[in-house]
């Protein structure tokens, strides 16, 4: 195994705007192009079929049965609800469903559907067998959600024409379609909406073994040479999340191209992850800030989510949906009726001795 302490790497200083390298692009143009390139790379890393999809074996097998049965009957599959933390493959799975069915995919998000008319316009443009993907479906406005009930059940909607006493309702038949909804907050879905999904699946965090396969596959797609132990190292720091694994791989690739002739070995991976502030547990700056606010600022808790978010300068939803699921899974934070509490594991991770009686202390 490579010894990182014996390997020296050079981290280049950033080039200032006043430096010798000039560009005809403005900062906004550069940012837009970089974001576009990152998006294209992310898309290229997505598996296209169920056979290519790594991990989530139960969801994959169940969904294969649902899709195969529908195709054999020549009908649109039941509507699908995918729930779970961000980055586990919900959007990718929606793309795969459309691919497996050989149909078109239309994509939108809950916050974008503010009015019933917004949804009606999208539904009326669907062709038979199309897949409609609504991300963050729990954030749909109520009028749009109520229109969706009838669309999901009867493949029709009532369009209101006019206002006041003279308003009339015109029924509009829809082509049979499959709705795929994704949510990170399944508890916020209303009962009537949840009940209209014929198949629901909970996406789980990935084990290191499956994440290693994700990293190896992504490296092959990107044309990056990587050692197996380096792939394991990246996977073990990816918080059980493929999206994070792919992102870390790209950052390690950048580091290796500057410092290791483009080849990623264990030492290069470890050094790169230190540079990008990802520790051995996969915690980043925000995760550690949450733990420090909880432990150093409030004695380990309990602390309410709003207070915790204020302490780290983030929205409560960010702390609750991005940081908390992994911190809970890693055994560092527990949720109680009075608020969040840091465990002994969290204290020790910050190099502190946990008080007696704390959860997980000896």
Curated annotation (Swiss-Prot):
UniProt: Mg(2+) binding residues: 91
Major site of localization recorded for this protein: cytoplasm
Domain of life: Bacteria
SMART domains linked to this entry: AAA
InterPro entries reported in the protein's UniProt record: AAA+_ATPase (IPR003593), AAA_lid_4 (IPR041445), DNA_helicase_Holl-junc_RuvB (IPR004605), P-loop_NTPase (IPR027417), RuvB-like_N (IPR008824), RuvB_C (IPR008823), WH-like_DNA-bd_sf (IPR036388), WH_DNA-bd_sf (IPR036390)
Chain intervals for the UniProt region annotation (Small ATPAse domain (RuvB-S)): 207-277
Subcellular compartments: Cytoplasm
Region of interest: Large ATPase domain (RuvB-L): 13-206
Keyword annotations from UniProtKB, A to Z: ATP-binding, Cytoplasm, DNA damage, DNA recombination, DNA repair, DNA-binding, Hydrolase, Nucleotide-binding
Record GO terms (molecular function): ATP binding; ATP hydrolysis activity; four-way junction DNA binding; four-way junction helicase activity
Region annotation (Disordered) ranges: 1-27
Gene Ontology CC terms: cytoplasm; Holliday junction resolvase complex
CDD domains, per database record: AAA
Protein EC: 3.6.4.-
Binding site residues for ATP: 45-46, 87, 90-92, 153-155, 196, 206, 243
GO biological process: DNA recombination; DNA repair
Substrates-to-products reaction catalysed: ATP + H2O = ADP + phosphate + H(+)
Binding site for DNA: 335, 340
Region (Head domain (RuvB-H)), start-end ranges: 280-362
Domain notes per entry: Has 3 domains, the large (RuvB-L) and small ATPase (RuvB-S) domains and the C-terminal head (RuvB-H) domain. The head domain binds DNA, while the ATPase domains jointly bind ATP, ADP or are empty depending on the state of the subunit in the translocation cycle. During a single DNA translocation step the structure of each domain remains the same, but their relative positions change.
Self-association and partners: Homohexamer. Forms an RuvA(8)-RuvB(12)-Holliday junction (HJ) complex. HJ DNA is sandwiched between 2 RuvA tetramers; dsDNA enters through RuvA and exits via RuvB. An RuvB hexamer assembles on each DNA strand where it exits the tetramer. Each RuvB hexamer is contacted by two RuvA subunits (via domain III) on 2 adjacent RuvB subunits; this complex drives branch migration. In the full resolvosome a probable DNA-RuvA(4)-RuvB(12)-RuvC(2) complex forms which resolves the HJ.
Similarity comment text for this entry: Belongs to the RuvB family.
Function: The RuvA-RuvB-RuvC complex processes Holliday junction (HJ) DNA during genetic recombination and DNA repair, while the RuvA-RuvB complex plays an important role in the rescue of blocked DNA replication forks via replication fork reversal (RFR). RuvA specifically binds to HJ cruciform DNA, conferring on it an open structure. The RuvB hexamer acts as an ATP-dependent pump, pulling dsDNA into and through the RuvAB complex. RuvB forms 2 homohexamers on either side of HJ DNA bound by 1 or 2 RuvA tetramers; 4 subunits per hexamer contact DNA at a time.
Listed PANTHER family: HOLLIDAY JUNCTION BRANCH MIGRATION COMPLEX SUBUNIT RUVB, PTHR42848
Name of the protein in question: Holliday junction branch migration complex subunit RuvB
Native organism: Corynebacterium diphtheriae (strain ATCC 700971 / NCTC 13129 / Biotype gravis)
């Amino acid at each position: 195994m490579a010894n990182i302490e014996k390997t020296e790497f050079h981290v280049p200083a950033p080039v200032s705007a006043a430096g010798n390298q000039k560009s005809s692009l403005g900062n906004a143009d550069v940012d837009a192009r970089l974001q576009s390139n990152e998006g294209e790379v992310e898309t290229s890393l997505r598996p296209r079929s169920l056979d290519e999809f790594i991990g989530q074996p139960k969801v994959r097998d169940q969904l294969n049965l649902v899709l195969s049965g529908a195709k054999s009957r020549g009908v649109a599959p039941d509507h699908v609800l995918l729930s779970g933390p961000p980055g586990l493959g919900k959007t990718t799975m929606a793309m795969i469903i459309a691919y497996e069915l050989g149909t078109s995919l239309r994509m939108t998000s809950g916050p974008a559907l503010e009015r019933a008319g917004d949804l009606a316009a999208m539904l009326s443009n669907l062709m038979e067998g199309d897949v409609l993907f609504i991300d963050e479906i729990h954030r749909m406005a109520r009028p749009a959600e109520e229109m969706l009930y009838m669309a999901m059940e009867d493949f029709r909607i009532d369009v209101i024409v006019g206002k006041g006493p003279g308003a009339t309702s015109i029924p509009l038949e829809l082509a049979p379609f499959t709705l795929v909804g994704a949510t990170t907050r399944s508890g916020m879905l209303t009962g009537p909406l949840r009940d209209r999904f014929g198949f629901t699946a909970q996406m789980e965090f990935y084990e290191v073994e499956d994440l290693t396969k994700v990293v190896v596959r992504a490296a092959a797609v990107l044309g990056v040479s990587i050692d197996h132990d380096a792939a394991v190292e990246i996977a073990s720091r990816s918080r059980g999340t493929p999206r994070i694994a792919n992102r870390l791989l790209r950052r390690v690739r950048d580091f290796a191209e500057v410092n290791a002739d483009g080849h990623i070995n264990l030492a290069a991976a470890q050094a790169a992850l230190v540079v990008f502030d990802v520790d051995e547990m996969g915690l980043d700056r925000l995760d550690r800030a949450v733990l420090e606010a909880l432990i150093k600022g409030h004695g380990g808790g309990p602390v309410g989510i709003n207070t915790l978010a204020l302490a780290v300068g983030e929205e409560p939803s960010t702390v609750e949906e991005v940081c908390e699921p992994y911190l809970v899974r890693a055994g560092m934070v527990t949720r109680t009726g009075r608020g969040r509490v840091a465990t002994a594991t969290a204290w020790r991770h910050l190099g502190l001795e946990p008080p007696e009686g704390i959860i997980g202390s000896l």
